[in-house]
Amino acid sequence: MAAKRKSKGVYMISAVAEMYEIHPQTLRLYEREGLLKPSRTEGNTRYYTDEDLERLEFILNLARDLGVNMAGIAIILQMRER
């Protein structure tokens, strides 16, 4: 389910939501739950890097394709980081 990225860089929440066909609130929820950690500008705007998008793709694969709930995703991400 890889979204097409035009170039390396940073992406605003609206662009990421459109690329992955998800609601911006979903991205905010993932951040609130600690699944994603986008950087922020001084004005508090979220910016997602290519690494954030790779992590999002992994999260969406777990949730959509495998049916893993958010608690399960959090555990899998923790295990993956070790």
What are these regions (language model features)?
Residues 2-19, 32, 37-38, 42, ...:
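Arg/Lys-rich, alpha-helical DNA-contact motif
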Residues 45:
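Conserved catalytic core of two-component sensor histidine kinases, primarily the HATPase_c ATP-binding
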Residues 23-26:
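Short coil turns linking two alpha-helices in DNA-binding domains
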